[in-house]
Amino acid sequence: MAKAKFERTKPHVNIGTIGHVDHGKTTTTAAITKVLADAYPELNEAFAFDAIDKAPEEKERGITINISHVEYQTEKRHYAHVDAPGHADYIKNMITGAAQMDGAILVVAATDGPMPQTREHVLLARQVGVPYILVALNKCDMVDDEEIIELVEMEIRELLAEQDYDEEAPIIHISALKALEGDEKWTQSIIDLMQACDDSIPDPERETDKPFLMPIEDIFTITGRGTVVTGRVERGSLKVNEDVEIIGIREKATTTTVTGIEMFRKLLDYTEAGDNCGLLLRGVKREDVERGQVVVKPGAYTPHTEFEGSVYVLSKDEGGRHTPFFDNYRPQFYFRTTDVTGVVKLPEGTEMVMPGDNVDMSVTLIQPVAMDEGLRFAIREGSRTVGAGRVTKIIK
């Protein structure tokens, strides 16, 4: 009896390959799919190098990113794996979050050791909150000298420690190319790599386990019943008759009770992350709430006006600005469902930011927004998206 393709029963983990150009990220990805397809044919299919390397273009908030998605399973887990072939694609993906990672495989060629992009990728992974990194030391078939490998390992551990990653993380010696060719020793190295992923990348916290949060998209008045707010539940779950807080955009929060939950015209007892639903609010007038606010579990989230963010600025070709911007630039920041104007402060020594750059900036919003680290936003001028970023630090 053939097993079903996608089993919900296994933990689902998002993973990706990162590292310097030509160190073998895509070859490693291809090798993982081949070796697992051979080991567990009923669970996996192999993806050829060319299929992964010719990454399809994706549009994420108007930004073009070349990125490949493959999936595979070990006995323990179901993995969704992203591979961004180009350095620029990797940076755009990390900042815009086209693919969120629960853990990353840092691919380093034993022949070169850590290179500038290796460092940059690890730094960026830290900034955007990738929780765990382990290492695939690739091309080990080309290095005979054990001492060289030891030196490279020391360098990698220093690099991980610099960015507060686990310096005791597994470093697995592999040859992705030899594994693709079917060499027994190196095929085993890929099995070891996946075992290390299973053992060392922590199970991600599921969105449903976090406190309730639903951004308001629309507001209706139902005569005789009250006000209904609709949106997609981003986190957590909520039962009828629980209290909620409505925060953001306005100075003061509103506290109320949810007296009804509706989805697809049916009344529900409860709703959870991923559902599109309407919440009937007790004693709330239509003018008390607005789009852009969020409905949350009381006390679980706070609105903020000042933050630091990591931002990718769209190039002219991507429909972005044609000219640079400077300190005190005042665009709109689009969070979840609404735009809020903000003032940009550039880092010390940065005179201006050119289209196509990535930059860290601090922002002061004119209205508070419920946020925590990792929240994504778009930067807009009117209806045109000119940048994308994520919150790296809350200031106030």
From Swiss-Prot:
Signal peptide feature range: none
**Region spans: G5:** 175-177
Q: Name one Pfam family in it.
A: GTP_EFTU_D3
Which residues does the annotated region (G4) include? Answer: 138-141
Q: Which UniProt keywords apply?
A: Cytoplasm, Elongation factor, GTP-binding, Hydrolase, Magnesium, Metal-binding, Nucleotide-binding, Protein biosynthesis
Q: Which reaction does it catalyse?
A: GTP + H2O = GDP + phosphate + H(+)
The protein's GO terms of the molecular function aspect are:
GTP binding; GTPase activity; translation elongation factor activity
Name the segments for region: G3: 83-86
PROSITE patterns in the cross-refs: G_TR_1, G_TR_2
| Matches recorded under InterPro entries | EF-Tu_GTP-bd (IPR041709), EF-Tu_GTPase (IPR050055), EFTu-like_2 (IPR004161), EFTU_2 (IPR033720), G_TR_CS (IPR031157), P-loop_NTPase (IPR027417), Small_GTP-bd (IPR005225), T_Tr_GTP-bd_dom (IPR000795)
Q: How does it assemble?
A: Monomer.
Q: What does this protein do?
A: GTP hydrolase that promotes the GTP-dependent binding of aminoacyl-tRNA to the A-site of ribosomes during protein biosynthesis.
Per the record, the similarity remark reads: Belongs to the TRAFAC class translation factor GTPase superfamily. Classic translation factor GTPase family. EF-Tu/EF-1A subfamily.
- The protein's name is Elongation factor Tu
Q: Which organism is it from?
A: Corynebacterium diphtheriae (strain ATCC 700971 / NCTC 13129 / Biotype gravis)
What gene codes for this chain?
tuf
